[in-house]
Amino acid sequence: MGKIVNLLKHSNSTIVNLRHFSGNALLVMTLFFSAIGCKNGIKNDLVKQAKPTIMVIPSDNLLKKNDALKKEIIDGADIYIRDYNCYLINDTKSKTAISIIQKAFIDAGYPLNDLDKNLKQLNDRSLRDEADGVKKDAKTLLLESVQPDIIIELDYSFDMDMNSRNFDREISYTLTAIDAYTNKVFSSNVYSGGKGQDFRTAFEDAIDDKIGTMMSEIDNYFGDIIENGREITVQFNIDRNSTIKLSDTYSSTGESYSEWIQDYMDYYTINGTYKLERNSDYEMHFVNVRIPTQKENGTQLNALGWARQCVKEMREKLKISSSNRAQGLSEVVITIK
């Protein structure tokens, strides 16, 4: 058995002389590698079976057509304010289309966040945020409160077919899959050519043409997240009233705060996956950061939880105070005071 352990330690050997092992040792070795293969197989199965939480929302184009998308200038920046309640009242067909898409995902086993049901809670929270002087639109509030994994944006048209003798309408739609955490578009499926007079019947027939392809693309994308971690951005900066610089040393070994941060990033990311984009005395900015989707105890881990743990470690090990000032699902902004 000792020879097997030594062999596993020296993995540079590509050829094994089986005559060096007894029959029992070969049996143990076979069982060992079979167990590894079984474990990897279970992991792969879990990745394949994992389903992201879905939320279906109307596109900005549909909101604009129904006067439910406004542009405001806040602190010199263009901010788009989305009114989903107004839109769903003005466009009843969209409510039908969303329910058909949702049913398809539910039937396929996906967890779902229902837009209509969450709007009441959203309105209550919006009132509280406005009382606090914080202006946020419906989409931002939805993502922060509901936290779906994937957003499906729907855009559609149901216009009269001028060439039809039966007064048919022609249906077309676009389904866009977006990572709710990074706002990255990873799938877009366009359909056109369906005809009919009843919207529900026409849309049910049309959705079957693309929904299977989109589900496969979603599964592949989410499988990568489960296996390789969720992508976020991480920024460390120094508060304007602080006397600390990231290049300052914090211990007798001469290690700087920036070196500690890089060591932390190496340890608390998936396979040390990140890119240091900016590095100065007052800021370190990391992109393409991959963090686990779960903690060691099996509970979910998001950017907020990751930042909370980092702030705690900095307080305990560096003896400095810091806070996470980020807004959004995929952003960490730790400010050192």
Role assignments for model-derived ranges:
Residues 65-151, 255-315:
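N-terminal segment of the mature soluble domain
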Residues 39-67, 184-275, 306, 310, ...:
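C-terminal/domain-edge helix-coil "capping" segments
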Residues 59-62, 118, 157-159, 176, ...:
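Solvent-exposed coil/turn segments that connect beta secondary-structure elements
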Residues 150-196, 331-337:
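Amphipathic beta-strand/beta-sheet edge segments enriched in Tyr/Trp
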Residues 49-51, 92, 96, 145-151, ...:
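Extracytoplasmic
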Residues 1-46:
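Bacterial Sec-dependent N-terminal signal peptides
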Residues 42-44, 138-142, 158-166:
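Catalytic micro-motifs at enzyme active sites that drive phosphoryl/nucleotidyl and oxygen chemistry
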Residues 64-66, 122-125, 161-165, 244:
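Extracytoplasmic/secreted cell-surface and envelope-processing proteins
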